[in-house]
């Protein structure tokens, strides 16, 4: 292998080409590669951050759902207590009304009973007087007297 001027010229041209590439072509390529690596790293970091944010959002949503269910249960329990209270109040009012109506009915019955007794006394007195008149008008005969008394008893 002979070293001649062509080989030296090619070597010098290759060295100049390598130096040119290292000076002007390689830095933009490295910058492009570094930017790409940085974008990929940022994208992965954003994906990790988004995944963590998603987990936090899901945890928060789950917590809010639990709180909403607890609040709903409290509202339902409070409504049930109020319902029971209203039912008890209605029962108490109904019992009081029933007692009042019964007392009023008993009072009316007692008043009617007293009125009937008084009326009966008046009728008995009238019948007794009428019987006494009849006895006095007739002769005091035992048979007639017992007949009148039987009629009076039948009328009473």
From Swiss-Prot:
Function: F(1)F(0) ATP synthase produces ATP from ADP in the presence of a proton or sodium gradient. F-type ATPases consist of two structural domains, F(1) containing the extramembraneous catalytic core and F(0) containing the membrane proton channel, linked together by a central stalk and a peripheral stalk. During catalysis, ATP synthesis in the catalytic domain of F(1) is coupled via a rotary mechanism of the central stalk subunits to proton translocation.
Protein's cellular compartments: Cell inner membrane
Gene name, Swiss-Prot/TrEMBL: atpF
Protein's membrane topology: Single-pass membrane protein
Similarity comment: Belongs to the ATPase B chain family.
MF terms in GO: proton-transporting ATP synthase activity, rotational mechanism; proton-transporting ATPase activity, rotational mechanism
KW NADP (keyword) present: no
Species of origin: Shewanella amazonensis (strain ATCC BAA-1098 / SB2B)
Main location: membrane
Annotated keywords: ATP synthesis, Cell inner membrane, Cell membrane, CF(0), Hydrogen ion transport, Ion transport, Membrane, Transmembrane, Transmembrane helix, Transport
Lineage: superkingdom: Bacteria
Entries under Pfam families matching the protein: ATP-synt_B
Entries under PANTHER family matching the protein: ATP SYNTHASE SUBUNIT B, ATP SYNTHASE SUBUNIT B', CHLOROPLASTIC
Subunit structure: F-type ATPases have 2 components, F(1) - the catalytic core - and F(0) - the membrane proton channel. F(1) has five subunits: alpha(3), beta(3), gamma(1), delta(1), epsilon(1). F(0) has three main subunits: a(1), b(2) and c(10-14). The alpha and beta chains form an alternating ring which encloses part of the gamma chain. F(1) is attached to F(0) by a central stalk formed by the gamma and epsilon chains, while a peripheral stalk is formed by the delta and b chains.
Phylogenetic lineage: Bacteria, Pseudomonadati, Pseudomonadota, Gammaproteobacteria, Alteromonadales
Name of the protein: ATP synthase subunit b
GO CC terms of this entry: plasma membrane; proton-transporting ATP synthase complex
CDD domains listed in its UniProt record: ATP-synt_Fo_b
Transmembrane segments: 7-29
InterPro entries hit by this protein: ATP_synth_B-like_membr_sf, ATP_synth_b/b'su_bac/chlpt, ATP_synth_F0_bsu_bac, ATP_synthase_B_chain
């Amino acid at each position: 292998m002979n070293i001649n001027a062509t080989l030296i010229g090619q070597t010098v041209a290759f060295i100049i080409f390598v130096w040119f590439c290292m000076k002007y072509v390689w830095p933009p390529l490295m910058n492009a590669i570094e930017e790409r690596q940085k974008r990929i790293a940022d994208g992965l970091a954003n994906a990790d951050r988004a995944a963590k944010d998603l987990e936090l959002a899901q945890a928060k949503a789950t917590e809010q759902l639990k709180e909403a269910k607890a609040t709903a249960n409290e509202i339902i329990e409070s409504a049930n207590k109020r319902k029971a209270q209203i039912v008890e109040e209605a029962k108490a009012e109904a019992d009081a009304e029933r007692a009042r109506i019964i007392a009023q009915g008993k009072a009316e019955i007692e008043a009617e009973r007293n009125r009937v007794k008084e009326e009966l006394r008046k009728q008995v007195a009238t019948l007794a007087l009428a019987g006494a008149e009849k006895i006095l008008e007739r002769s005091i005969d035992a048979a007639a007297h017992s007949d009148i008394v039987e009629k009076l008893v039948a009328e009473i």
